[in-house]
């Protein structure tokens, strides 16, 4: 169920190779696939011979934006990361929702967004459809655009010219710093991190002194 890399002349190594999907059939709850020759078929007949290049994990634009500010001992450094124009195969969404193991706790989407009866327009296939897991199809390829606050640092530098009590402590200078990593994240794709590696923000404080 994971797209495998292919090495074909004229194609990028970052291309995503999957079988084209036309979505979930409202009548049967099965996924409708499009074969390489243009013929429609069901997910039961998925074949590696029908995979085609759809999407590219290499973004068209990516980079960092950095800025610094200082004023009377105060200072700040901030860094942003951007990435636009690429695609991603949402493997975690496939594993944890579409092909969820019902022996364990599952995401609510396993039942709420899944086909249940004829006429349903659903995002995910009928539950345990013929005992087969969903293979690699274009249904799980998503446009990925990201703008992220990578790091933020705010500090105050004290010396004998701007902070009088520094000399009373026998110091020539001191610096208090607050750092924050991944302080915000925006993406067109909801991050499916699972339970093993939950998202976390990092905060640190630092004090540097000079005598």
Name each model-derived stretch:
Residues 1-57:
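Conserved small-residue
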Residues 39-48, 126-138, 184-189:
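Flexible, solvent-exposed coil segments and beta strand-coil junctions
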Residues 71-74, 171-173, 200-202:
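Strand-connecting loop/turn motifs
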Residues 152, 199-211:
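Outer-membrane beta-barrel "beta-signal"
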């Amino acid at each position: 169920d994971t797209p495998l890399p292919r090495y074909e002349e004229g194609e990028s190594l970052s291309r995503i190779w999957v079988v084209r999907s036309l979505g979930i059939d409202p009548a049967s709850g099965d996924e409708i696939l499009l074969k390489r020759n243009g013929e429609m078929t069901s997910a039961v007949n998925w074949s590696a011979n029908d995979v085609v290049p759809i999407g590219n994990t290499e973004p068209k634009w990516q980079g960092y934006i950095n800025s610094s500010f200082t004023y009377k001992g105060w200072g700040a450094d901030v860094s942003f990361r951007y990435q636009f124009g690429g695609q991603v195969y949402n493997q975690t969404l496939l594993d944890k929702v579409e092909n969820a193991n019902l022996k364990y706790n599952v995401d609510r989407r396993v039942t709420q967004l899944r086909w249940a009866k004829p006429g349903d327009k659903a995002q995910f296939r009928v539950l345990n459809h013929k005992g087969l897991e969903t293979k690699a199809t274009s249904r799980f390829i998503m446009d990925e655009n990201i703008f992220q606050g990578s790091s933020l640092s705010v500090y105050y530098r004290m010396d004998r010219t701007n902070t009088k009590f520094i000399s009373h402590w026998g110091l020539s200078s001191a610096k208090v710093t607050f750092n924050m990593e991944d302080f915000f994240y925006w993406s067109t794709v909801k991050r499916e991190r699972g339970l093993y590696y939950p998202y976390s923000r990092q905060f640190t404080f630092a004090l540097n002194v000079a005598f």
